[in-house]
Swiss-Prot record:
Phylogenetic classification of the source organism: Bacteria, Bacillati, Bacillota, Clostridia, Eubacteriales
GO molecular function, one term: tRNA binding
Organism: Clostridium novyi (strain NT)
NCBIfam families: alaS
UniProt feature coiled coil, ranges: none
EC number: 6.1.1.7
Cofactor binding notes: Binds 1 zinc ion per subunit.
Family that this chain belongs to: Belongs to the class-II aminoacyl-tRNA synthetase family.
Matches recorded under CDD domains: AlaRS_core
Swiss-Prot/TrEMBL catalytic activity: tRNA(Ala) + L-alanine + ATP = L-alanyl-tRNA(Ala) + AMP + diphosphate
Encoding gene (name): alaS
Name of the protein: Alanine--tRNA ligase
A cellular component annotation (GO) from this entry: cytosol
Keyword tRNA-binding applies: yes
């Protein structure tokens, strides 16, 4: 392996795929076009979505790009770690209904091992659990070590987003350490520790997922790949972090020179150097793509990056404006790849300079005031700065809250967010536009974690489903409030609650909070980071204020159904250990009022017999009508009692043990029914693999189980009615019908062959010659598959030397076949080329050998145009 610069890697990649027939497209702007779902382009395929969805026709079916991307979701970590960045480049090769796995996998291996010359013994491949096709191609068309291929589940190797196109993926990884990874479990460990580094993801978009969750095969599958350029450069240069990569290090060295310091000597200074280096790359690209600083949307992202970088310049002791001086270094390293940087060099510098000057006018005076605030707090031995003072900095001096928090954090000081949010209602929209944290009913999740620690909330809902309590906290519109009124959504925190907060895989309770003239629906219940129980509410009547007494009532029926499913999960766990083996352990679960999901360790799918045994064992236990007994004890006492605990869960001094007869004993903080008999019925709905060594069972209980069985019974009745037989005779009747259908298929095939033979004489009468080579062509109707091939064979045998090209419209689509005698193949004829070119005209694709090939198309109206083009293609092929 030879060292390669970042720019060399990019060029090598794009050139390689150009040599494979790809059109090299320049990077799209980081500003999305006609895509309101994105603030900024954050992935290589994002600008190509219209081509993948069919809304637009791509300029070529094979495309390769290196795309500029901006991601700010982890902005707080940028600089503090050596791998986070807001700007990165994503290389990709894409196929829009052209090639597929057979081509892209060998190409990926060829580029990795022959162009980049990465040592094969350092390379590891992951594929989707059930993707045998990918495994066969990896092992037959490349020389990858089969022991270096690991199968993983959906979470790692299957790409889908709701309904629509989706598919499995295959990733290539570089192992940094010596030795060999011997198992999927070890591989996951090494990957999590950044020792096995994923550098290329090949996504095989071969399914269309419908609203019912069915995966339907796409007629023309797509390829979407992504290789992070900076990450690949770290591998090629043998460095650990992106900030050591040649082009990025060059920019960092420029920043260090301006700060009169050296990278690697002081970690605090290194953080600032990394932040400035990354942020200047981002802002240069954003400005070159016409983003300007503002107080909303992507303009606010730009402003925040600029001001964060400027502030870290101050920390490094850099005097005056300086960010614009680094732009030359950015352009020097990236200008060839992105000429817009060169073209707009002066413009970029000017925008940065103006924004930096504006901030400089406020930051010096703001810093002086903040310094006074900090000194005053330290003098009085206090650790909380009032929200009023923080708001004054923000409102009067343009000091972003994030910047104030960051500076205070370095001094161990926090902000009184309660009073700050009261002062800042009118500024909420600005903050929301820039934040990436998810929201619930208009409430910023981040604010939940600022509930004062002295506010205590107690869960009293194991025995009580309703109780009186006092309102201690109200949050609405991203701020703490004194009251909440009819029509408003928000959060209510009380000192006691019967509502179970989502935890341990169990969904949160729903219900109501009420008082005289007041009613609110509790739509969810969660814990904040500090363990406070918060109720997400929508007020339907009246209003409530802090310290008011309220009645909290849990939806009893829903809680009972959740309890049935949770208790059934414990029984399922115990049954699996008895039927499958003691190696079975829970690796995840989800319980709501309708169903349960249980993930467990096991290395193969369960047989029908095993599933039946598990289901029967759970139902036998339900019939035993054991009480569900709960008891608090120490963790040691619990373990001595035989209780199962989850190794990755954290437990306190006292734990809650849930026991169901002699069948199941587990540590659990969730809610359950009082007796296993109340579960009623347990029914397994599905069993599947989600990762190597991890299986998933989904099941239903009680009335939902009855509904499931009734639905299956209804289906059987409908099928029996359609087949005109009794339910017990369905299988025999289906076997009989299959046999009859096979006989009919043979008859139809024979008739089609006869029909096709009727065209034989006409085709032979109209044989043409192209440069001395006989050419038999025809456009037919309703001649498909075997009949079309048989007709082609007959004509080829009769003309002895020459080419036969036939096209036929069948059920709204087009089929093509081409055949050639060996002597004309030696003259340059290639059937694969012929069908590929004519299939394009009919909106399809295909290929094959020089002497025989077939293809398909979806535009029957173009059949004659396609067949008429054969003569021209032959003119170019025949030597």
């Amino acid at each position: 392996m030879e060292k390669m610069g970042l720019n060399q890697v990019r060029e090598a990649y794009l050139k390689f795929f150009e040599s494979k027939g790809h059109l090299r497209l320049p990077s799209f702007s980081v500003v999305p076009k006609n895509d309101k779902s994105l603030l900024l382009i954050n992935a290589g395929m994002a600008p190509l979505k219209p081509y993948f969805t069919g809304l637009q026709t791509p300029p070529r079916k094979r495309v390769t790009t290196c795309q500029k991307c901006i991601r700010t979701g982890d902005i707080e970590n940028v600089g503090k770690t050596s791998r986070h960045a807001t700007f990165f480049e994503m290389m990709g090769n894409f196929s829009f209904g052209d090639y597929f796995k057979n081509e892209v996998i060998p190409w990926a291996w060829e580029f990795t091992t022959e162009v980049l010359k990465l040592p094969k013994e350092k390379l590891y491949v992951t594929i989707y659990l059930d993707d045998d096709e990918a495994y066969d191609i990896w092992t037959s068309k490349t020389d990858v070590d089969p022991k270096h291929i690991f199968r993983l589940g959906k979470e790692d190797n299957f790409w889908e987003h709701g309904v629509g196109p989706c598919g499995p993926c295959s990733e290539i990884h570089f192992y940094k350490d010596n030795g060999e990874i011997k198992s999927a479990e070890e591989f996951i460990e090494k990957s999590d520790a950044d020792r096995a580094v994923e550098f290329w993801n090949l996504v095989f978009t071969q399914f269309d997922k419908d609203e019912d969750g069915n995966y339907n095969r796409l007629e023309f599958p797509n390829i979407d790949t992504g290789m992070g350029l900076e990450r690949m450069a770290t591998i090629m240069q043998g460095v650990e972090t992106i900030f050591e990569v040649d082009t990025i290090k060059s920019i960092l060295d420029k920043v260090a020179a301006l700060a009169n310091t050296k990278y690697g000597e002081d970690e605090l200074k290194d953080v600032s150097l990394r932040i400035i280096t990354d942020h200047v790359r981002s802002v240069s690209v954003m400005i070159s793509d016409e983003v300007l600083p503002s107080n909303e949307g992507r303009g606010y992202v730009l402003r925040r990056l600029l001001r964060r970088a400027a502030r870290h310049g101050k920390l490094l002791g850099i005097k005056g404006t300086f960010l614009y001086k680094i732009v030359d270094s950015v352009i020097e390293n990236s200008g060839e790849a992105y000429p817009e940087l060169k073209e707009k060099k002066d413009y970029i510098k000017k925008v940065i300079s103006i924004e930096e000057e504006r901030f400089a006018e406020t930051i010096d005076s703001g810093m002086e005031i903040l310094k006074e605030y900090i000194e005053d707090l330290e003098k009085n031995n206090k650790k909380v700065l009032s929200g009023e003072k923080v708001f004054k900095l923000y409102d009067t001096y343009g000091f972003p809250l994030e910047l104030t928090e960051e500076i205070l954090e370095e001094k161990g000081i926090t902000v009184d967010m309660d009073s700050f949010n009261k002062e800042m209602k009118e500024q909420r929209e600005r903050a929301r536009a820039a934040r990436s944290e998810s929201t619930y009913m208009g409430t910023d999740v981040k604010i939940l974690d600022t509930i004062p620690s002295e506010i205590e909330t107690t869960f009293d809902g194991y025995e009580n489903l309703e109780l009186q309590s006092k309102v201690k906290v109200i949050i609405k519109d991203d701020a703490f409030a004194d009251c909440i009124n009819k029509g408003e959504k928000g959060i209510i925190v009380t000192d006691r609650t019967p509502f179970y907060a989502e935890m341990g895989g169990q969904i949160g309770d729903k219900g109501t909070i009420s008082a005289d003239g007041f009613m609110a629906k509790v739509q969810d219940c969660k814990n904040n980071i500090g363990g406070k129980i918060v109720h997400f509410v929508e007020v339907t009547e009246g209003s409530i204020k802090l310290e008011d007494e309220v009645l909290l009532e849990v939806d009893r029926k829903r809680r009972e159904n959740i309890g049935k499913n949770h208790s059934a999960t414990h029984l399922l766990h115990a049954a699996l250990r008895k039927v499958v083996g003691e190696h079975v352990h829970q690796s995840g679960s989800y319980v709501d009022e309708d169903k349960l999901r249980f993930d467990f360790t096991h290395f193969e799918s369960l047989t029908h017999e095993e599933l039946k045994k598990v289901e029967d064992l759970v139902n036998d236990t339900i019939e035993s009508v054991w009480d569900v007994v709960t008891k608090e004890m120490t963790i040691e006492e619990a373990k001595n009692s035989g209780a199962m605990a989850l190794f990755d869960e954290k437990y306190g001094d006292k734990v809650r043990v849930v026991k169901m007869g002699d069948f199941s004993t587990e540590l659990c903080g969730g809610t359950h029914i009082s007796n296993v008999g109340k579960i009623g019925l347990f029914k397994i709905v599905s069993e599947s693999g989600i990762a190597a060594g991890t299986r998933r069972i989904e099941a239903v209980t009680g009335h939902k189980a009855l509904e499931f069985i009734e639905h299956k019974s209804d289906l059987l009745r409908q099928i029996a009615s359609m087949l005109k037989c009794s339910e017990k005779d369905i299988i025999n009747r289906l076997n009989q019908q299959n046999a009859e259908l096979k006989d009919k298929d043979k008859e139809i095939s024979a008739l089609k062959s006869k029909l096709a033979s009727g065209s034989e004489d006409d085709i032979l009468k109209n044989i043409k010659e192209v440069k001395g080579v006989k050419l038999a062509v025809a456009a037919l109707k309703d001649v498909d598959g075997e009949a079309l091939r048989n007709l082609g064979d007959k004509i080829k045998n009769k003309i002895e030397s020459g080419v036969v090209v036939l096209g036929s419209e069948v059920e709204g689509k087009v089929q093509f076949i081409a055949m050639a005698s060996k002597d004309v193949v030696s003259k340059g004829v290639h059937c694969g080329t012929i069908v590929r070119e004519i299939a394009k005209i009919a909106g399809g694709g295909g290929g094959g050998r020089p002497d025989m090939a077939q293809a398909g198309g979806r535009l029957p109206e173009k059949l004659n145009d396609a067949i008429n083009e054969v003569e021209n293609i032959m003119e170019n092929l025949v030597k």
